[in-house]
């Protein structure tokens, strides 16, 4: 079947930059979905997106649908004909429904069947509907109307190109009649641009100063920004989201280096970077030491004969922004950081849980408690907790919310606070996301864990649990943050005790009954998802969870040991044996003695197992106490042979009550040795 290239381009007013790439992807997805539903084959398809256009190019699209056969089944043969072979009303009705004589109906199968071959339709007649359906399904939160038209789209439409091979596909979509006339760059080539063929689309527009390919523009900008930064003896900060947004703002990108006064470098560089990135869409430059350079890169959408004018204009625009940041910084430094705490007495943390000031007091107490138990400085942790929320009341954070914690660090340093105290004011918010940086100090870790536990206990304590996708207080992230800090920083903290301490600090603000258990279950349940992401089988997690270790670090050490144990050849048999032992002991109506009586060991197999368990117990106990769980399980793996022999040769439930109880005691000792690490019966 013959095929042609297909191109559709919808021209618009400037599209929302943050949504441009996703709109292009959705446009392509919708068209591919429509083509597949129509049975139209093609070789490849891709989208193009620029500020004023969305386009899709489909290569080697079939010019016509294939013919298809439709089978329509009717009544069973026994219902279609009577005993004399005459057609019944059911048969006649089926033939009438199909619009044919009964003679044309297939009677060879168990049911009447009518088969009809439907000729495939030309693709050109189907394409307008496919394109329109895709446009209607674009993820546009709010559509708009323009002029006096009834059509709605994300922005007013300006033109429509639709070519199938060399021919225009005649149609009208979103108030635009299809043609082959596109538009060039708004300033360089404002006139119409004739698209000679779908394959020539990119080059035809390139000649009109338009790079329609989003990926090409993105790569060009990234490359040129890196080159310009290197020329300035620096490196550019290029967040992917900013690069995408800038790419979506320009059709003909021209990066240019601009500068600002060095006096602004006295302001925390994070504030300068925030305002230049978020408000002006500039790429900031850092020196080899990671310090901000007094230069930045803007990406113009025009190739000017006088680029110095564009540079000058951007420098004038950014100056007031930097001046504001400078003003806020100087104003805040006029008073001690701790003085801002008074303002927090009137700032509500949560209506039922009190003010941010009260939260800081609780965080201070809990941070000191935690620091003392992880080897940190309790006094410094308490001080950091007191100061932890002060910067929320500053002018700087009021203008730049992203500066919370960072501003606190600078103001604490300016005020002569200890370095770890100052760092903790920023580190309390770590990790800020999945895989993000963790606190570098014990003081920072203590405050970060305390802050998160305080939030978890408080919100759970008033019954505002996260449900489904709704988690307004980011409790899942808080729980994962606590776990990451304690596990990855190798900090051994009894989380049960810490959560109970957090509950006590709230007093009667929360419903304390069962609260600690609820919070702990929530936190440790987050470990399940963490391990699943790491490829750890859920059974391994459950084998450790059954013991309810109170320290996340201890929990992780056990999980890693069980994961290693599962790779041993003895693991499967011992897991099954432990499950069998668990069932035997659960069904026992006799009281199990605490110790094994060697004089009651009658069979050779039980004597061998008794000796093996006793020896293993003496060796495993110190290993488990030292948390060398991997070595402990490796030692217990040697019990496989005596365990297998015991179950093969020994009847546990004998009539002699004393012997039976002694065998229960032996099995309990065996199981207890493994339970010092995990319940491996759950691995089966």
From Swiss-Prot:
Stated EC number for the protein is 6.1.1.14
Q: Does the keyword Coiled coil apply?
A: no
The entry's keywords? Aminoacyl-tRNA synthetase, ATP-binding, Cytoplasm, Ligase, Nucleotide-binding, Protein biosynthesis
Q: Name one GO molecular function term.
A: glycine-tRNA ligase activity
Q: What class of enzyme is it?
A: ligase
One GO cellular component this record assigns the protein to is: cytosol
- What does the UniProt entry say about where the protein is found? Cytoplasm
Q: What does it catalyze?
A: tRNA(Gly) + glycine + ATP = glycyl-tRNA(Gly) + AMP + diphosphate
Q: Which domain of life is it from?
A: Bacteria
Does Protein biosynthesis count among this protein's keywords?
Answer: yes
NCBIfam families of this UniProt entry? glyS
Q: Which HAMAP family does UniProt cross-reference here?
A: Gly_tRNA_synth_beta (MF_00255)
Subunit organization = Tetramer of two alpha and two beta subunits.
In Swiss-Prot or TrEMBL terms, this protein is called Glycine--tRNA ligase beta subunit
Q: Taxonomy-wise, where does this protein's organism fall, top ranks first?
A: Bacteria, Pseudomonadati, Pseudomonadota, Gammaproteobacteria, Pseudomonadales
Gene designation per UniProt? glyS
């Amino acid at each position: 079947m013959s095929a042609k290239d297909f191109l559709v381009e919808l021209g618009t007013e400037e599209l929302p930059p943050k949504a441009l790439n996703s709109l292009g992807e959705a446009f392509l997805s919708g068209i591919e979905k429509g083509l597949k539903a129509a049975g139209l084959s093609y070789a490849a398809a891709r989208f193009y997106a620029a500020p004023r256009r969305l386009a899709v190019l489909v290569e080697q699209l079939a010019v016509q649908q294939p013919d298809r056969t439709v089978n329509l089944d009717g009544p069973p043969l026994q219902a279609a004909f009577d005993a004399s072979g005459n057609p019944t009303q059911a048969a006649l009705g089926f033939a009438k429904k199909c619009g044919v004589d009964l003679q044309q109906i297939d009677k060879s199968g168990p049911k009447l069947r009518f088969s009809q071959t439907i000729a495939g339709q030309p693709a050109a007649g189907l394409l307008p509907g496919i394109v329109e359906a895709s446009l209607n399904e674009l993820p546009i939160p709010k559509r708009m109307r323009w002029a006096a038209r009834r059509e709605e789209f994300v922005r007013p439409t300006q033109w429509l190109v639709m070519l199938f091979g060399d021919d225009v596909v005649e149609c009208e979509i979103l108030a635009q009649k299809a043609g082959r006339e596109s538009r060039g760059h708004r300033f360089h080539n404002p006139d119409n641009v004739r698209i000679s063929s779908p394959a020539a689309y990119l080059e035809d527009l390139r000649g009109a100063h338009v790079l329609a390919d989003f990926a090409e523009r993105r790569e060009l900008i990234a490359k040129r920004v890196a080159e310009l930064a290197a020329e300035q003896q620096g490196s550019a900060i290029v967040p992917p989201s900013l690069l995408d947004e800038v790419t979506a703002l320009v059709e003909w990108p021209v990066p240019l280096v601009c500068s600002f006064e060095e006096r602004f470098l006295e302001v925390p560089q994070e504030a300068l970077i925030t305002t230049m990135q978020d408000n002006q869409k500039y790429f900031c430059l850092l020196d080899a030491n990671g310090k901000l350079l007094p230069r930045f890169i803007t990406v113009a959408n025009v190739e000017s004969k006088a680029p110095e004018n564009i540079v000058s204009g951007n420098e004038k625009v950014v100056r007031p922004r930097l001046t504001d940041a400078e003003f806020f910084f100087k104003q805040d430094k006029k008073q001690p950081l701790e003085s801002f705490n008074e303002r927090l007495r009137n700032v509500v943390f949560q209506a039922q849980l009190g003010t941010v000031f009260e939260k800081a007091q609780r965080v201070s107490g809990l941070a000191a408690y935690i620091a003392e138990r992880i080897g940190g400085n309790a006094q410094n942790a308490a001080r950091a907790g007191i100061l932890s929320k002060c910067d929320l009341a500053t002018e700087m954070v009021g203008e730049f919310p992203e500066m919370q914690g960072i501003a606190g660090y600078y103001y604490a340093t300016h005020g002569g606070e200890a370095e770890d105290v100052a760092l903790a004011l920023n580190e309390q918010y770590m990790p800020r996301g999945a895989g993000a940086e963790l606190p570098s100090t014990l003081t920072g870790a203590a405050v970060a864990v305390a802050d998160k536990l305080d939030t978890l206990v408080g919100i759970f304590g008033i019954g505002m649990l996260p449900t489904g996708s709704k988690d307004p207080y980011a409790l899942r992230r808080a729980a994962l943050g606590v776990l990451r800090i304690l596990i990855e920083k190798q900090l051994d903290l009894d989380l049960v005790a810490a959560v109970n301490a957090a509950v006590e600090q709230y007093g009667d603000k929360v419903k304390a009954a069962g609260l600690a258990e609820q919070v702990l279950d929530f936190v440790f349940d987050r470990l399940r998802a963490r391990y699943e992401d790491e490829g750890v089988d859920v059974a391994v997690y459950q084998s450790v969870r059954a013991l309810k270790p109170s320290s996340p670090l201890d929990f992780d050490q056990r999980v890693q040991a069980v994961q290693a144990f599962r790779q041993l050849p003895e693991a499967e048999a011992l897991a099954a044996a432990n499950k069998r032992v668990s069932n035997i002991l659960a069904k026992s109506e006799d009281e199990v003695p605490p110790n094994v009586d060697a004089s009651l060991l009658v069979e050779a197999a039980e004597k061998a197992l008794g000796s093996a368990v006793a020896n293993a117990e003496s060796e495993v106990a110190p290993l488990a106490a030292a948390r060398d769980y991997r070595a402990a399980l490796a030692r217990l793996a040697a019990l496989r042979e005596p365990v297998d022999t015991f179950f093969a040769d020994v009847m546990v439930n004998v009539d002699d009550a004393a012997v039976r109880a002694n065998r229960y005691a032996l099995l309990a000792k065996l199981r207890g040795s493994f339970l010092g690490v995990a319940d491996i019966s759950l691995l089966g």
